[in-house]
Structure formats: structure tokens, C-alpha cells
A protein has these predicted regions:
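The feature captures the beta-strand-to-loop junction immediately N-terminal to the Walker
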Residues: 35-37
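Conserved coupling/switch loops of ABC nucleotide-binding domains, chiefly the family-specific signature
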Residues: 56-59, 109, 209, 241
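Non-catalytic connector elements of ABC transporters
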Residues: 237, 247-356
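ABC ATPase nucleotide-binding domains
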Residues: 31, 72-78, 82-229
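Conserved ABC transporter NBD signature motif
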Residues: 58-66
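Helix-to-loop junction immediately C-terminal to a conserved catalytic motif
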Residues: 50
Length: 356
């Protein structure tokens, strides 16, 4: 039995549908992300689990117990929001101890638990500081420590990094995942940032318009997207429109502007001859050669734009009436291309994904 289960969960706000017929199973100790654009229903789903929002239909179970109609305080769930909610009139110690004081634990036990939580989040020595004396990342650590110290069954994180700058977000991604691994707590993470989900998650549920479109590991979601929407939403994508010529098992031959290429069909997709299909190839999977190269070409193209980004050089290549973006590592031996150079665009056979 899964540790957390959503069974047929829907949430309607009047005539507006926020979540529709949601089924999810999350294992104990798993880092599970709900990923999708704004308004897709991911935060509503999280708040239904926390008890702040009541489902219109369906049931939610935690460790075999139906919690659908329980108030938040009866669910043993901790939640961290993006705005931290640190009490400005309290010290770091007092903020972290707040939940323990409410539970009327002995003073010595409170100090022991708070000291342990401070050490866990790397904030030992900050006990007497106030909110105004903390950076954004430090505030987020305090908010997380305040939740972890009460030892909840489940940790919910609702876009906790969105208020931080890029450098701090990168640091906090790895820090949160390390903390989760260390504590072993079942964690459900809400984000619209695919990088956060790919970096930290054991599994991801991609949502749109109140529905789950695909559930899988980060590798499965990135390399085997179930739809064009997911291919576009997760990472950067080259999407080439074509027509299925032949299907042999999981391999689909595709006509793209008069050139035949192949793509692999993902597990849940099928195609038939003559059907319109989209070929997905990630920018980092594509290779370029000048037209006199010996490798067999996949598509012929012309360099239309060159973007220098330090560690990589990006080329926008026109192939027929479509374009692909190619990302090349910037090495000392890199053979630079110029605008309007004619090139061959190719990739490994298993790097192209056919999406009906």
C-alpha cells in the first residue's frame, strides 16, 4: 500500500475546475514533485493534502488512514510556503521552538530538539538572530527547521525557492534534497520550475489544467515525454513536425520536409502510417558537421543564429521551413561555424522521440 494516496480527488470552485479526478500514489520516504504551469492545480492538490482545502469529491489516505475530512492539526503534516512566514518579533531559536512550545514539551526537551534542528539545517550559532538579520536562504532554512523539529509524517513544500535569487536557488536545491535524504521524510514538492523537479525528485507528476498528464522518474519524464505539452514544458525542446511513414515496433520512420529520419515511440504512444507526428530532439543531443563530412546526414540545414554563452555555443539551424537549436560545448578545439554556413544535423537513433 502506498503511503499517500489520492483517490478520485476533484476540487471545483463554483464553475471553475481546479483539480479533476486525480489519482496519485506516493511511497514512504519518497521525494515526489508536482510540476506544472501556474493554475494547473498543483498547489490546490497540496493544500487538500494539508487540510486547508476540502475536496469536492474523492478521498485522501495517509499511511492507510482516511484524512479527507480531518482538520490540518490532526494530520501530522508540516508545510513550508514560499514566503517563509518567519515571526519577526522572535529569535531564530524561538521561531523553531514555536511548535514544540505549543505542544507544551518540557523546556529541556525543547532545547535539545531545537539544537538538533539547527545543526541539521546548518544554522548552529544563529539562535539569537532575528528575521531582519537573516538572508533569504537562511530564512528558508529556519522555516524548514521549524517544520522538521515537530517530526511530521509528511513534509509539504509549496514553491519554497521562488523568492530566492538564481544562485541561492541552485544552492538550496541540493541542500533540501540532502536534508530530505538525511531525515528520510516523505516529501511532496510543488514547483513550476522543471530544473528543481528534475534535480531533486525521485518521481514527478506533470500537471496541466487540473489533471495529471504523466508520472515518472526525472529521466523518464525528460527522455520519454508522453505528449507534446510535456516535451515543451520539460527542458528545452526541438520539435519537428512530420508524417509517419512506417512503424516497426517502437521505431517510427518520419518524413520531415522530404527527408526520412527515425524516432522511438514512448511506452504509452502509438502511431500509424500517414499520421502527423512530432519528432523531439533535445539541443544537447544534436551534432553538426559541415556538408563535406563523411557521416550520413539526418537533415541538411543552414546556420541562422549564433549565441555565445561562455561554456556553450548555441546555433539556430534552419532545416527546411523549420528550425532546431543546437548546443555545443565550448572547447579550445571547437570548430566555429559562421552565419549562413550549410551543415548536416544528426543525432543518435535513440535520441529522437516520436510523439503522435
Amino acid at each position: 500500500m502506498a503511503y499517500v494516496e489520492f483517490n478520485g480527488i476533484s476540487k471545483h470552485f463554483g464553475s471553475s475546475v481546479a483539480v479533476e479526478n486525480l489519482d496519485l500514489k506516493i511511497e514512504q520516504g519518497e521525494f515526489f514533485s508536482l510540476l506544472g504551469p501556474s493554475g494547473c492545480g498543483k498547489s490546490t492538490t497540496l493544500r487538500m493534502l494539508a487540510g486547508f482545502v476540502k475536496p469536492t469529491t474523492g478521498h485522501i489516505q495517509v499511511n492507510g488512514r482516511d484524512v479527507t475530512h480531518l482538520p490540518p492539526e490532526a494530520r501530522d503534516i508540516g508545510i513550508v510556503f514560499q514566503n517563509y512566514a518567519i515571526f519577526p518579533h522572535m529569535t531564530v531559536f524561538e521561531n523553531i521552538a514555536f511548535g514544540l512550545v505549543e505542544r507544551k514539551l518540557p523546556r529541556a526537551e525543547i532545547k535539545q530538539k531545537v539544537d538538533a534542528a539547527l545543526a541539521e539545517v546548518g544554522m548552529t550559532g544563529f539562535e539569537d538572530r532575528y528575521e531582519r538579520e537573516l538572508s533569504g536562504g537562511q530564512k528558508q532554512r529556519v522555516a524548514l527547521a521549524r517544520v522538521l523539529v515537530i517530526e511530521p509524517e509528511i513534509l509539504l513544500l509549496d514553491e519554497p525557492l521562488s523568492a530566492l535569487d538564481k544562485k541561492m536557488r541552485e544552492e538550496m536545491k541540493f541542500w533540501i534534497k540532502n536534508i530530505q535524504n538525511s531525515v528520510g521524510i516523505t516529501t511532496i514538492y510543488v514547483t513550476h520550475d522543471q530544473s528543481e523537479a528534475l534535480t531533486m525528485s525521485d518521481r514527478i507528476a506533470v500537471m496541466d489544467q487540473g489533471r495529471v498528464l504523466q508520472i515518472g522518474t526525472p529521466v523518464e519524464i525528460y527522455e520519454q515525454p508522453a505528449s507534446r505539452f510535456i516535451a515543451e514544458f520539460i527542458g528545452e525542446s526541438n520539435l519537428l513536425d512530420g508524417t509517419a511513414l512506417d512503424v516497426d515496433g517502437a521505431v517510427c520512420s518520419i518524413d520531415i520536409d522530404g527527408t526520412t529520419v527515425t524516432g522511438r515511440l514512448t511506452q504509452n504512444n502509438a502511431a500509424v502510417q500517414g499520421q502527423a507526428v512530432t519528432l523531439l530532439v533535445r539541443p544537447e543531443m544534436i551534432r553538426l558537421h559541415s556538408l563535406d563530412a563523411s557521416e550520413k546526414p539526418k537533415l541538411n540545414g543552414t546556420v541562422r543564429e549564433i549565441i555565445y554563452q561562455g561554456s556553450v555555443v548555441r546555433y539556430r539551424i534552419q532545416v527546411g521551413h523549420q528550425h532546431v537549436m543546437v548546443e555545443v560545448a565550448n572547447r579550445p578545439d571547437l570548430a566555429r561555424l559562421d552565419l549562413d554556413d550549410d551543415v548536416e544535423v544528426y543525432w543518435n537513433a535513440d535520441s529522437g522521440v516520436a510523439i503522435p
